[in-house]
Amino acid sequence: MLTKRIIPCLDIKNGRTVKGVNFLDLKDAGDPVALAQKYAEEGADELVFLDISATEEDRKTVIDLVRKVSETINIPFTVGGGISSVNDVEILLKNGADKVSINSSAVKNPQLINDLASAFGSQCIVVAIDAKQINGNWKVHLVGGKVATEIDLFDWAKEVENRGAGEILFTSMDHDGTKNGFANEALAKLSQTVNIPIIASGGAGTMQHFADAFLLGNADAALAASVFHFQEIRIQDLKIALKNNTIQIRL
């Protein structure tokens, strides 16, 4: 078993870190640069920085903030939000991002995945997929979960892998912000469907939820926001608990 990763997510709106429940009712969870530094020092394996206003308001990701965050931390760092071209990615990588995450733009223009993988290598291309169950079937949603599609989660995951994505960041819209645990059945099915790493997102509330995502969901990494931002779970404590649960983790 490869070492599992713990990834705090910084949702950014207007230059501040925010976190809502089910993608609505955003609360201010602080300064992104300070939070990034805190997480790096506490032992986070990676960070994800999503400019959640970028796609919706057609605003490009906050380049200055990316630069400041990258100057502050020494762990891998993924940036998403408003990315729709090879040029967008080039700018982000030049300003310190290690990887980029694309979501709505990949669904609207799947060829973008091929183009980015060709230009920069699969290792820095993460495709984020937001999905929820509609009549028992997992369907992909766009624009922060606001727009439903007819696309099947597992078909889309296979396609993004075939097009060159290096990783999938899967958020269950049904679980996001609820703190009731990750979508482990869907995660397990995803891990059987594709051979690239899966990052689990949506539903973290307890340390056991992280263990379940790895042991039941076969996730390669687990991402969370509010439990870290509001210090309900400390990363170091979480990692020790996971290690005690026979999960391979970097302490």
Curated annotation (Swiss-Prot):
**Family per record:** Belongs to the HisA/HisF family.
CDD domains found in the cross-reference section = HisF
User: Which BP terms in the Gene Ontology apply to this protein?
Assistant: L-histidine biosynthetic process
Pfam families according to UniProt:
His_biosynth
As for subcellular location, the record says:
Cytoplasm
Keyword Aminoacyl-tRNA synthetase appears in the UniProt entry: no
Write the gene name.
hisF
Positions annotated as active site in the UniProt record: 11, 130
Write the protein's name.
Imidazole glycerol phosphate synthase subunit HisF
- Function recorded in the entry: IGPS catalyzes the conversion of PRFAR and glutamine to IGP, AICAR and glutamate. The HisF subunit catalyzes the cyclization activity that produces IGP and AICAR from PRFAR using the ammonia provided by the HisH subunit.
Q: What is its EC number?
A: 4.3.2.10
Which Gene Ontology terms cover its molecular function?
Answer: imidazoleglycerol-phosphate synthase activity; lyase activity
Q: Which UniProt keywords apply?
A: Amino-acid biosynthesis, Cytoplasm, Histidine biosynthesis, Lyase
UniProt GO cellular component terms: cytoplasm
> Hey, which pathway is this one from?
Amino-acid biosynthesis; L-histidine biosynthesis; L-histidine from 5-phospho-alpha-D-ribose 1-diphosphate: step 5/9
Q: Domain of life here?
A: Bacteria
The enzyme class is: lyase
Under catalytic activity, the entry for this protein gives: 5-[(5-phospho-1-deoxy-D-ribulos-1-ylimino)methylamino]-1-(5-phospho-beta-D-ribosyl)imidazole-4-carboxamide + L-glutamine = D-erythro-1-(imidazol-4-yl)glycerol 3-phosphate + 5-amino-1-(5-phospho-beta-D-ribosyl)imidazole-4-carboxamide + L-glutamate + H(+)
Q: Subunit details for this protein? A: Heterodimer of HisH and HisF.
